[in-house]
Amino acid sequence: MKYTTFGIISLFLSVTWALRFELAASFEPKPFCIRDFVEAGNQVVITMESDGRVGDGQVLSFYVIDSMGNEHRRKKNFAEKLNVAFTAPSSAVFDVCFENKAEAAGRSLMRNVEVNIESGSAARDWDKIRSAEKLRPAEVQLRQVEEMSDEIVERLNYLKLREERLRDTNESTNRRVRNFSMAVIVVFAALCAWQLNYLKNYFRAKHII
């Protein structure tokens, strides 16, 4: 049973997810973005591979930017394989965006792009760590599980703090709306009282009442 469980964990850790898509060339290309989340201090490794070549009538560009406004990498007119690595300065959502600009009219062109994004423990070079610390394969896998568990806890804590901030913002907005509504009611009531008093004085002046 222990070996079966450990084998399942090993299989889970060895899975690598990649996104493949086609990006048509256009004179005014719209960005095609892939979004992910990373905790503060974690390393992110992005591997991109495209078919075609530089000078084939298409200018494939990309940039990496996070929700805090930090631009981690930008490159224009790339083909084949490219690796990008950066360390997140803060917990944030980041976007990997692609644009494919056509250089000439009359041709229907596109690029096939494959993107693989790894962060945290998945982005570390575990073979190098195993050699440096002289760890056995089982110890390496346990270290991976431990780090992944820590990352899950960190992400849950971040989501909890974010939920608290959103709740505080929501409650503050509700208070402002309620206070504004009360102020509108008071002003409306005062205006009605003033209008009634004005009409009463007007009718008295005209000897209507």
Curated annotation (Swiss-Prot):
Region forming the signal peptide: 1-18
Biological processes per GO annotation: endoplasmic reticulum to Golgi vesicle-mediated transport; Golgi organization; intracellular protein transport
A Pfam family annotated for this UniProt entry: EMP24_GP25L
Family label: Belongs to the EMP24/GP25L family.
Ranges of residues in domain GOLD: 31-119
Cytoplasmic side: 200-209
Bilayer topology: Single-pass type I membrane protein
UniProt-recorded name of the protein: Endoplasmic reticulum vesicle protein 25
PROSITE patterns associated with the record: GOLD
One Gene Ontology term, aspect cellular component: endoplasmic reticulum-Golgi intermediate compartment
Ranges of the Lumenal topological domain: 19-178
TM segment ranges: 179-199
Function: Constituent of COPII-coated endoplasmic reticulum-derived transport vesicles. Required for efficient transport of a subset of secretory proteins to the Golgi. Facilitates retrograde transport from the Golgi to the endoplasmic reticulum.
Organism: Eremothecium gossypii (strain ATCC 10895 / CBS 109.51 / FGSC 9923 / NRRL Y-1056)
Xref: SMART domains: EMP24_GP25L
Compartment(s): Endoplasmic reticulum membrane; Golgi apparatus membrane
